[in-house]
């Protein structure tokens, strides 16, 4: 099958690239997705406590004012299920599914110099040819399954945050061991601890985290963000990481200790990533 463009992955980036290539550039485009649904990171990472650490009103597409204003987020930091629902909404809104094939993992991509084409093969023995190949696999979807001695002979249940099963897992009255305290580990531990008989966390490197101060979004906040669509979109292009808060140009040493503590305390109470933008 010959196409103008092939996109690998149906997450945030892949869906946007499909819209861009197909709807705006008029290219015959196909998305190849390993999973059985759109979502990318938010399809694979469905472990207990999984949610975004970026505020919902900016963790979304801004290319469409209609989509931005029609979707209503529930929380400051949305859960995995809410983000997945959002991406499914966008997929339906833009009629993207008809140009996505699921349950196909790209296993090779070779550039054929004489034909000036890419040859893309999947694990289902499908072969495609295209002029443009776009990788939208991201960096948070490939699970790193550690080679732990004895894991194959372990008699109990074990799970990986990046490949969490669809079925509901109960930790009630269970002795649980958790390995790792990265972003996923920090989110998983407090949820598991609520029902487990005991929870032991194995940590190699301590991480620093700030409080999220998560909360339900008020009608006033939702109304204000939608009315400020253009201003928010403009601000996102001018800040590191695309966040809707400005980074201070001042050094921490430009203030005395009393002033420094006041600035930090204010950011701490506000919660979230803006803490790192104080200085």
Where is each model-derived feature located?
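Rossmann-like NAD(P)H-binding beta-loop-alpha module
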Residues: 174-196
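N-terminal FAD-binding dinucleotide-binding subdomain shared by FAD-dependent oxidases/monooxygenases
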Residues: 1-5, 10-151, 167, 181, ...
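A short, basic/flexible loop-to-alpha-helix module at the beginning of a structural domain
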Residues: 1-3, 159-173
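Conserved beta-strand scaffold positions in the cores of enzyme catalytic domains, especially
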Residues: 100-101, 156-159
């Amino acid at each position: 099958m010959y196409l103008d463009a092939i996109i690998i992955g149906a997450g945030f980036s892949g869906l946007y690239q499909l819209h861009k290539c197909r709807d705006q550039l008029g290219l015959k485009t196909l998305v190849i997705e390993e999973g059985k649904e759109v979502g990318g990171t938010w399809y694979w990472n469905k472990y207990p406590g999984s949610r975004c650490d970026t505020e919902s009103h900016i963790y979304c597409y801004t290319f469409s004012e209609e989509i931005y204003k029609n979707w209503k987020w529930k929380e400051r930091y949305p859960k995995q299920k809410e983000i997945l629902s959002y991406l499914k909404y966008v997929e339906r809104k833009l009629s993207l599914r008809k140009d996505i094939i699921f349950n196909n993992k790209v296993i090779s991509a070779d550039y054929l110099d004489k034909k000036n084409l890419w040859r893309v093969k999947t694990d289902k023995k499908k072969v495609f040819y295209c002029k443009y190949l776009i990788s939208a696999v991201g960096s948070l979807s490939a699970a790193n399954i550690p080679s732990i001695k004895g894991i194959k002979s372990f008699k109990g249940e074990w799970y990986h945050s990046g490949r969490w099963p669809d079925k509901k897992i109960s930790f009630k009255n269970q002795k649980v061991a958790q390995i790792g305290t990265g972003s996923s580990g920090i989110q998983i531990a407090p949820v598991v601890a609520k029902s487990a008989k005991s929870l032991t966390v194995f940590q190699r490197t301590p991480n620093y985290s700030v409080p999220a101060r998560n909360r339900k979004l008020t009608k006033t906040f939702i109304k204000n963000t939608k009315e400020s669509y253009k201003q928010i979109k403009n601000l996102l292009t001018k800040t590191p990481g695309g966040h809707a808060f400005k980074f201070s140009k001042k050094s921490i040493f430009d203030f005395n200790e009393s002033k420094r503590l006041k600035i930090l305390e204010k950011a701490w109470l506000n919660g979230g990533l803006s803490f790192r933008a104080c200085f």
